[in-house]
């Protein structure tokens, strides 16, 4: 079996968090295949308000975190089984994107207005995990996508800050398999992401359906044809992509990423 690996490339434009997340609209994730079969998972993190103290974080095996809970307190402790590295904002615990020693990568993406977490409950103290700590939690405990799904079934994910948007997540393993997690009306919904693209709102299944609006787009140049007694030809290469959206809304970025990658 051909050996596959995941390299996570993270391109940072600016960073913000918490209340500043209301100004953040542009995260785009793509997936590329190398000639040797390796999978490259890449993304942008484009936040408008400030850099908000973005930093690289290296977390060794056996490191212990405390889960944040609403109101500024701390909840359960969790200890990393695997070492991992990534990019965090504001403080080390709030990792936005990372990869562990097993090659599993995880990242969160802004997901306003369409997600809804379950309500925080003290009764779930031992299984509560805040949304902005889920990347760290998963990277420290899981090696495969199936393990991610099993681990998430054992926890309760709640909002870290009521002023912040909900988020959704992308998880990718060395085999190339990738999933998206969204929490809709308090329920975890998983999607197999064979396309390898993720942006923001609306939901992932809507973004896939929206690609049907661009079924006419093809690589290359449109062939000449006649219209009545006129002979028509394109102005140049790329004309078969005429109609590709050029704005920076999440649906348009999703379409561009899907066709360009």
Region locations from a protein language model:
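Bacterial N-terminal signal peptides that target proteins for export
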Residues: 1-10
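C-terminal segment of classical bacterial N-terminal signal peptides
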Residues: 15-24
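A contiguous strand-loop segment
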Residues: 25-126, 163
């Amino acid at each position: 079996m051909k050996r596959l690996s995941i390299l996570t490339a993270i391109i940072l434009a600016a960073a913000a968090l918490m209340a500043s997340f209301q100004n953040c609209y542009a995260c785009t994730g793509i997936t590329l295949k190398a000639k040797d079969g390796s999978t490259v998972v890449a993304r942008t993190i484009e936040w408008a308000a400030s850099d908000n103290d973005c930093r690289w974080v290296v977390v060794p095996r056996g490191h212990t975190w405390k889960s944040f809970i609403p109101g500024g307190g701390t909840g359960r402790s969790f200890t990393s089984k695997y070492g991992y590295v990534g990019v965090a904002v504001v403080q080390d615990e709030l990792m936005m994107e990372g990869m562990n020693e097993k090659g599993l990568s995880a990242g969160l993406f802004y997901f306003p207005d369409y997600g809804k977490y379950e309500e925080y409950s003290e009764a779930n103290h031992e299984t509560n995990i805040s949304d902005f700590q889920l990347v760290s939690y998963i990277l420290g405990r899981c090696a495969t996508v199936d393990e991610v799904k099993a681990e998430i079934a054992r926890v309760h994910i709640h909002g870290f800050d009521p002023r912040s948007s909900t988020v959704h997540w992308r998880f990718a393993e060395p085999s190339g398999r990738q999933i998206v997690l969204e929490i809709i009306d308090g329920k975890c919904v998983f999607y197999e992401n064979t396309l390898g693209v993720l942006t923001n709102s609306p939901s992932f299944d809507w973004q896939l359906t929206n690609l049907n609006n661009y079924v006419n787009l093809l690589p290359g140049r449109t062939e000449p044809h006649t219209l009545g007694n006129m002979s028509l030809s394109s102005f140049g290469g790329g004309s078969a992509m005429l109609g590709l959206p050029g704005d920076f809304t999440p649906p348009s970025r999703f379409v561009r990423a899907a066709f360009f990658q």
